[in-house]
Amino acid sequence: MLLAFLLAVSVADWVPVHWPSGGVKSLELLKGTAVNCILIEPSAWSRDFSSAAANQGVDVLGVVKPSKDALEQARRAKDLGLSGISLEGEFDDNVRKSLTDSNIPFVEIGPRINMRMEGAALVSATNQGVWPGINTVEDTAKAAPSGGPWIDTNTGFLRFTRAASDLPVWIANTPPPKTIVPVERYLQAIGDAAMSGARWVVTFEDDFANKLMARDPATLAGWARITQLLAFIEEHKQWRAWRPGGEMAVVQDVNSGALISGGVLDMIAVKHTPVRPAPTSRLNPALMKGATMAVNMDPASLNDAQKQVLREFTRNGGSLLSGPPGWKFPAAKPGEITLAKDDVEKLDAIWKELNTMTGRRNLGARLFNVSSMLSNLLVSPDGKRTLLYLVNYSNYPVDSVTIHLTGKFKRARIYQPGKKPLDLAIYPIEEGTGVDVEQIKEFGALLVE
């Protein structure tokens, strides 16, 4: 897509926020932060605002929602000097074609089933997602099939999307309506996306937005924590290019439930087992490199070349669990992003098979005292360094985290927002290398080499 507007920042480096004001003075809140792309409603559009934002190195995307005058709104945004358009909702191909022909940059933030995984799109984005955090039912933590508390997360879906697309991935899920959200939940939403290499389009609930614009001291302190985490992630943006490091691969695609939250990838992650998505459409030997186990969710969907990849995988010593027809999860439907009740019951059967297959084997990393956390294991392009993201979904710090990694490492360092990198002691274990982390507050990254 040719960019008619002069963008202040490369699209791949956009750090997006739904901004609640079109007042030029509100831009002061962005100074010194990593935020460089704001999405604003039509009522907030003005040439003065877009000009001031551009002078500050911030791109402004005008939010356009489905309506009969959507194209007119887009042209108005162009006339007012906005950087581009954020199409939020479902639009027909005529709107996309007209914007492209008019050389107006746009991102599409709509249903998961309409996500652009390839082609000329600027980003692959959706506005559908669960609100990350520990799922509670009547104040009691809901149990996952693995026995631990169930954590609502978008990571499985986002990991698949990252593996299936070369585009930047955004998720623009919103806080629960009419709910005052503690700042920790915003941090969890940012971390939930970031550890999968995606970005959450930061969106405030009304109370936070109003207090932020009013410069309420407590809200400003919360905003500082949000921007601190965003800055930390961007300071280490090179980690997005690292490949999945888990030894278990899940062969799955859009038509077998990969766009659904709460499915197999999430179930395995909740067990704290490193897992890598292997999109059927991209299945090749390189994708399976380093994997020792694989789950094929829909064997009937594979073509001959893809079947050959899995045959070679097993010939080279890999273990393959091919699911029966009853294991196949349905493709995502309009308005649905989580498993139906009948499909949830499938997870129990799949879990039992996976548990038998994996036993107590360490598939890259084994974590202890992390019931409120999720992790993601990555390997550097040269294969010499390993990174373990750690995200805490409780509103309180987690102390005394123990990590057992496969492989022999000589150095370990923990990175956390607002703290200097800290070298950690390592010790030999039967599986490879042990590391103890004193505390994880919200988000951390353990780097070993």
Identify the residue ranges that each predicted region occupies.
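Exposed aromatic-hydrophobic patches
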Residues: 403, 434-438
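Short beta-strand-to-coil "C-cap" segments at the C-terminal boundary of structured domains/repeats
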Residues: 447-449
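Solvent-exposed beta-hairpin/edge-strand motifs
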Residues: 404-421
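Glycan-processing catalytic domains of CAZymes
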Residues: 6-300, 304-333, 337-345, 434
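Extracellular/luminal ectodomains and secreted, surface-exposed scaffolds of diverse proteins
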Residues: 420-430
